[in-house]
From Swiss-Prot:
Additional note from the record: Heme 1 (or BL or b562) is low-potential and absorbs at about 562 nm, and heme 2 (or BH or b566) is high-potential and absorbs at about 566 nm.
Designated name of the protein: Cytochrome b
Transmembrane segments: 34-54, 78-99, 114-134, 179-199, 227-247, 289-309, 321-341, 348-368
Membrane topology field: Multi-pass membrane protein
Lineage of the species this protein comes from: Eukaryota, Metazoa, Chordata, Craniata, Vertebrata
Molecular function, one GO term: metal ion binding
Organism: Zootoca vivipara
Underlying gene: MT-CYB
Length: 380
């Protein structure tokens, strides 16, 4: 009888137990594909990013022209840059769908895996923000100025902290250099934290749409789910290539085609589309400190989900009232994203304030109350 090579070599044994012979519930749907898609996005970002870093210059006098040089003079530079910029959008689409699936199917019950996932979200958001500054266009410069200025709300340390982050009295060469360093370094940290995320996930075993224990009925990951993931990967890559080749600037901001000018403020400063919902929450509170607190809490509120879970059932599969609340939350986030891209004027201000209030109400009041009501109706 021959021994399988993958089960005798230490490194291959880890790969085998994580991606080949991993016991997986037989009934997980396509919503479980997004974890692997995020891994593909991360690897694609690292590879394209490395090639871009070979030609990019982190200096305010030549950063903008170095991006133009990548597009015009570097062989396939335009393609590498378009793939890098648009796979960031794909990354966030996948990450939001991944979180949405976790919220719907009660994946947050695995508190360690969920907490590390929230940390990963914060790291990815930080990396994307640093990357947005690097082309040194108008929106890059003013986005960096506005967002880093939010640190000044911290009591006592605020103003000093802002100058320390800037490396001077304004966003300048030192800021660009350190942001490039962080943008280069963070993806590798994300890669390491993702490994820990997987480690904790495989410790408990994957959740499934029923929310019930599936230890008695599992199948190996390969070939069943590896081929299923491959289909998802091909669909995502097709969409990414469509964006990169046909409309690479659709998700970007036209202001970034103008080199950074500290003397001219753009009419409407806004971040990338995937941050618009948090930006709308930030803007909806007139007080600066209150806005920053709301911005932070809009992400950190995800850490409270294991504590606010009141239902006797894990998933929302058999809870129609909770499903209605969930889809209302999704619509609310879409409204916030839309409002974040609009100028600060009536009626967008009041819509943003109402949508922001609703966002926190869903997490803190509606979801727990509806879960308790369902328990009552089911006489549990």
């Amino acid at each position: 009888m021959t021994t399988k090579y993958t089960k005798t070599t230490p490194i291959l044994l880890i790969i085998n137990s994580s991606f080949i012979d991993l016991p997986t519930p037989w009934n997980i749907s396509a919503w479980w594909n997004f974890g692997s898609l995020l891994g593909i996005c991360l690897l694609l970002e690292i590879i394209t990013g490395l090639f871009l870093a070979m030609h990019y210059t982190a200096d305010i006098s030549s950063a903008f022209s170095s991006v133009a040089h990548i597009h015009r003079d570097v062989q396939h530079g335009w393609l590498i840059r378009n793939l890098h910029a648009n796979s960031a959008s794909m990354f966030f689409i996948c990450i939001y769908l991944h979180i949405g699936r976790g919220l719907y199917y009660g994946s947050y019950i695995y508190t360690e895996t969920w907490s590390i996932g929230v940390l990963l979200l914060l790291l990815v958001m930080a990396t994307a923000f640093f990357g947005y500054v690097l082309p040194w266009g108008q929106m890059s410069f003013w986005g960096a100025t506005v967002i880093t200025n939010l640190l000044s709300t911290m009591p006592y340390l605020g103003p000093t902290l802002v100058k320390w982050v800037w490396g001077g009295f304004a966003v300048d060469n030192a800021t660009l250099t350190r942001f490039f360093t962080f943008h280069f370094m963070l993806p590798f940290i994300i890669l390491g934290v993702s490994m820990i995320h997987l480690l904790f996930l495989h410790e408990n075993g994957s959740n499934n749409p029923t929310g019930l224990n599936s230890d008695t009925d599992k199948i190996p990951f390969h070939p069943y789910y590896s081929y299923k993931d491959l289909l998802g990967t091909l669909m995502m890559l097709a969409l990414l290539i469509f964006f990169a080749l046909f409309s690479p600037n659709l998700l970007g901001d036209p202001e970034n085609f103008t080199p950074a000018n500290p003397l001219i403020t753009p009419p409407h400063i806004k971040p990338e589309w995937y941050f618009l919902f948090t930006y709308a929450i930030l803007r909806s509170i007139p007080n600066k400190l209150g806005g920053v607190m709301a911005l932070l809490f809009s992400i950190l509120i995800l850490l409270m989900l294991p504590m606010t879970h009141m239902s006797k059932q894990r998933t929302m599969s058999y809870r129609p009232m909770s499903q209605a609340v969930f889809w209302l939350l999704v619509s609310d986030i879409i409204i916030l994203t839309s409002i974040g891209g609009q100028p600060v004027e009536h009626p967008f201000i009041i819509i943003g304030q109402l949508a922001s209030t609703l966002y926190f109400t869903f997490f803190l009041l509606l979801m727990p109350m509806v879960a308790l009501m369902e328990n009552k109706l089911l006489k549990w």
